Amino acid sequence: MAEERAPRGRDRDRNREEKVDDGMIEKLVAVNRVSKTVKGGRQFTFTALTVVGDGLGKVGFGYGKAREVPVAIQKSMEQARKNLATVDLNNGTLWHAVKSGHGAARVYMQPASEGTGVIAGGAMRAVLEAVGVKNVLAKAVGSRNPINLVRATLKGLSEVQSPARVAAKRGKKVEELNHG
């Protein structure tokens, strides 16, 4: 049986996943080198964008900056753990379709049937996998900037509401809601 190869080229660093002792899924979305020109030349720093989730509906993102890549990643992971938000999920998918945006990044996500998988690109995929979504159809339109895409995805996920929550807000029973 052939061994599975590691991703090469552009996919090499994309969506590195790690499970830590506390059961959180950590995903590295992007690492960027930033240069600042000073009198003596250029100073290089690194930024890291990470997403952390428990796979059961909690997710957060962090953005860290440092002179070294590992330090930037660690800072962003710590920030992501501090900013966890809860998302209403429906057996591994969303309750309803949702549109959202941040800056020029626009995202569209809709629930998918069992066996579809996560059909999403780049930064959106990292967020959806970390939060625990197993089946979803998603599309990013406009800017593909990873930070704005992560923010737009999280904003969209926060807008997803279960029928029970909608009914509670309206002071009704779930059966009384008009599904049509």
Swiss-Prot record:
Keywords for the protein's UniProt record, in alphabetical order: Ribonucleoprotein, Ribosomal protein, RNA-binding, rRNA-binding
Record's protein name: Small ribosomal subunit protein uS5
Keyword RNA-binding: yes
Domain-level remarks: The N-terminal domain interacts with the head of the 30S subunit; the C-terminal domain interacts with the body and contacts protein S4. The interaction surface between S4 and S5 is involved in control of translational fidelity.
Subunit record text: Part of the 30S ribosomal subunit. Contacts proteins S4 and S8.
Domain S5 DRBM: 24-87
GO biological process: translation
Native source organism of the sequence: Xanthomonas campestris pv. campestris (strain ATCC 33913 / DSM 3586 / NCPPB 528 / LMG 568 / P 25)
NCBIfam families noted in UniProt: rpsE_bact (TIGR01021)
Pfam families, sorted: Ribosomal_S5, Ribosomal_S5_C
GO cellular component: cytosolic small ribosomal subunit
GO MF annotation terms: rRNA binding; structural constituent of ribosome
Keyword Transport attached: no
Family classification: Belongs to the universal ribosomal protein uS5 family.
Gene name as annotated: rpsE
InterPro entries for this protein: Ribosomal_Su5_D2-typ_SF, Ribosomal_uS5, Ribosomal_uS5_bac-type, Ribosomal_uS5_C, Ribosomal_uS5_N, Ribosomal_uS5_N_CS, Ribsml_uS5_D2-typ_fold_subgr
Job of this protein: With S4 and S12 plays an important role in translational accuracy.
